[in-house]
């Protein structure tokens, strides 16, 4: 007779191991599992562990040719989610040998590849990952990181200011460059290509790069400050993307940009590597993230996508505002902002952090607050995000009644006033509006901005909430 018993067997017999002690080298995952009616949580959790590691739906004779005990994922703990019927957090440990070194692509293919279409589950969400130091060390991470960026730009002790050029589509390269110049001349540190701006018929990429470089050099000469424009190198194939980054380097500009989810992790890691070797900073936009992270019970939480970006490489990444028009509940947002910036982050479920994460000196990423923010939000942004952040006002700069440069002036004055007040020990949460009003006396540009945006609010209930 054959040396194994054929047929379908329950996953939990092999893959549910509550007695397992996790290793320091394991990758740990926290999944929010919603089983189909009648499927016990142990079976559902074990199924997730199996299908995202060594398992298949039946016993196969080739199982005997390897050591399942060495390579299988294990569901080692299950917690019911409070307030939800039949929903569980299942913790899974994966042996490090299952993953290719330095490949975010392979890590995701394994952990979230097949299992999300699994019939025994109604829904599945990856809430958090613990990346062990042994695996972190196989990644180069951000091209430069927060400290090196500050040194390159010679800007310290305050958040950096940006602005997305609008209208995002339709401007000619010359007019686009003019808008860039006005914003930088007015006092911003950076301007930004919109994520949709690649190389369209109305503005080919090379023309845009040239006019933006001219704007950067002119504004630098006039202000004595280092300026940058995020030139979007995202393209239809990776060779073209690198070609655009090479051209940016030849122009001598400080920073390029990439849409890391639509472009893909493989392309992103290649670009990050090029940027490191050639002294370019890399700004990352998260277009498409909400498709993946918006549903509470299915998909991947953004904190996982943020960790993945830090491994793949990027110096800035968009991370919500807490205020403004885009999603972000304060504690949760600050949780993944710290995961981006800090070297060591303690487990803290009140901030949505399921595991203690040690980045072992991988460079940090600057979070970018962008989307529906204006001068009245400045006090909150400075208080929430602190100095290591980029605050991006698109409409909040270009929508100024007097034009782009005065819009930039208003934002810079508002920022400097808030930072100075904070440094003097004043309470931004309580006195913030007063601080901005005082600054209006010295800046007619700020006064005009405060008047325009005094009534605007985006009031909707948060979607991304804690249990």
UniProtKB/Swiss-Prot annotation:
<keyword id="KW-0460">Magnesium</keyword>
<comment type="function">
    <text>RuBisCO catalyzes two reactions: the carboxylation of D-ribulose 1,5-bisphosphate, the primary event in carbon dioxide fixation, as well as the oxidative fragmentation of the pentose substrate in the photorespiration process. Both reactions occur simultaneously and in competition at the same active site.</text>
</comment>
<dbReference type="Pfam" id="PF00016">
    <property type="entry name" value="RuBisCO_large"/>
</dbReference>
<protein>
    <recommendedName>
        <fullName>Ribulose bisphosphate carboxylase large chain</fullName>
        <ecNumber>4.1.1.39</ecNumber>
    </recommendedName>
</protein>
<keyword id="KW-0150">Chloroplast</keyword>
<keyword id="KW-0120">Carbon dioxide fixation</keyword>
<feature type="active site" description="Proton acceptor">
    <location>
        <position position="166"/>
    </location>
</feature>
<keyword id="KW-0934">Plastid</keyword>
<dbReference type="InterPro" id="IPR020878">
    <property type="entry name" value="RuBisCo_large_chain_AS"/>
</dbReference>
<dbReference type="InterPro" id="IPR036422">
    <property type="entry name" value="RuBisCO_lsu_N_sf"/>
</dbReference>
<keyword id="KW-0113">Calvin cycle</keyword>
<dbReference type="GO" id="GO:0009507">
    <property type="term" value="C:chloroplast"/>
</dbReference>
<dbReference type="GO" id="GO:0016984">
    <property type="term" value="F:ribulose-bisphosphate carboxylase activity"/>
</dbReference>
<feature type="binding site" description="in homodimeric partner">
    <location>
        <position position="114"/>
    </location>
    <ligand>
        <name>substrate</name>
    </ligand>
</feature>
<feature type="site" description="Transition state stabilizer">
    <location>
        <position position="325"/>
    </location>
</feature>
<feature type="binding site">
    <location>
        <position position="195"/>
    </location>
    <ligand>
        <name>Mg(2+)</name>
    </ligand>
</feature>
<comment type="similarity">
    <text>Belongs to the RuBisCO large chain family. Type I subfamily.</text>
</comment>
<keyword id="KW-0503">Monooxygenase</keyword>
<feature type="modified residue" description="N6,N6,N6-trimethyllysine">
    <location>
        <position position="5"/>
    </location>
</feature>
<dbReference type="InterPro" id="IPR033966">
    <property type="entry name" value="RuBisCO"/>
</dbReference>
<comment type="subunit">
    <text>Heterohexadecamer of 8 large chains and 8 small chains; disulfide-linked. The disulfide link is formed within the large subunit homodimers.</text>
</comment>
<keyword id="KW-0456">Lyase</keyword>
<feature type="binding site">
    <location>
        <position position="370"/>
    </location>
    <ligand>
        <name>substrate</name>
    </ligand>
</feature>
<dbReference type="InterPro" id="IPR020888">
    <property type="entry name" value="RuBisCO_lsuI"/>
</dbReference>
<dbReference type="InterPro" id="IPR000685">
    <property type="entry name" value="RuBisCO_lsu_C"/>
</dbReference>
<keyword id="KW-0479">Metal-binding</keyword>
<feature type="active site" description="Proton acceptor">
    <location>
        <position position="285"/>
    </location>
</feature>
<keyword id="KW-0488">Methylation</keyword>
<dbReference type="Pfam" id="PF02788">
    <property type="entry name" value="RuBisCO_large_N"/>
</dbReference>
<keyword id="KW-0601">Photorespiration</keyword>
<keyword id="KW-0560">Oxidoreductase</keyword>
<feature type="binding site">
    <location>
        <position position="318"/>
    </location>
    <ligand>
        <name>substrate</name>
    </ligand>
</feature>
<feature type="binding site">
    <location>
        <position position="194"/>
    </location>
    <ligand>
        <name>Mg(2+)</name>
    </ligand>
</feature>
<feature type="binding site" description="via carbamate group">
    <location>
        <position position="192"/>
    </location>
    <ligand>
        <name>Mg(2+)</name>
    </ligand>
</feature>
<feature type="binding site">
    <location>
        <position position="164"/>
    </location>
    <ligand>
        <name>substrate</name>
    </ligand>
</feature>
<feature type="modified residue" description="N6-carboxylysine">
    <location>
        <position position="192"/>
    </location>
</feature>
<dbReference type="GO" id="GO:0000287">
    <property type="term" value="F:magnesium ion binding"/>
</dbReference>
<dbReference type="GO" id="GO:0004497">
    <property type="term" value="F:monooxygenase activity"/>
</dbReference>
<keyword id="KW-0602">Photosynthesis</keyword>
<keyword id="KW-1015">Disulfide bond</keyword>
<dbReference type="InterPro" id="IPR017443">
    <property type="entry name" value="RuBisCO_lsu_fd_N"/>
</dbReference>
<feature type="binding site">
    <location>
        <position position="286"/>
    </location>
    <ligand>
        <name>substrate</name>
    </ligand>
</feature>
